[in-house]
């Protein structure tokens, strides 16, 4: 039962982080054509999960409860695949097909890249 509570608590924190950080990024970019706030939190979450999941797996730095809290709860709520999908569909629905395609490409390529970079960083720094 503690594990479920910790995942929920992490999810609450991650959701608040997503709201605050995503809004800040969107306002900072001044772009209303592309959802840079969602892209930014997805990139950050991908980078962090690359680092932290790698350290958890290779170095055993997290207990099962901590993994649930951080990886499933916080980072699961921070990254926003459902929001990404909704915003992309909205772009397509509004006739901005090039923007919708760019958003899909940017999210997939950059998030995969940042998971890889996070993993590489974790493996090189924390040997």
Which role fits each region the language model picked out?
Residues 1-127:
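Membrane-interface helix-loop junctions in multi-pass transporters/channels
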């Amino acid at each position: 039962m503690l594990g479920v509570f910790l995942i929920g608590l992490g999810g609450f924190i991650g959701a608040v982080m997503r709201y605050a950080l995503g809004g800040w990024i969107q306002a900072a970019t001044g772009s209303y054509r592309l959802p840079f706030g969602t892209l930014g939190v997805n990139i950050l979450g991908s980078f962090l999960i690359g680092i932290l999941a790698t350290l958890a797996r290779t170095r055993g730095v997290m207990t099962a409860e901590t993994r649930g809290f951080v990886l499933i709860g916080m980072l699961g709520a921070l990254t926003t695949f459902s929001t990404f999908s909704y915003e992309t569909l909205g772009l397509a629905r509004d006739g901005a097909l090039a923007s919708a395609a760019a958003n899909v490409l940017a999210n997939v390529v950059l998030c995969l890249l940042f998971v890889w970079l996070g993993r590489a960083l974790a493996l090189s720094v924390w040997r």
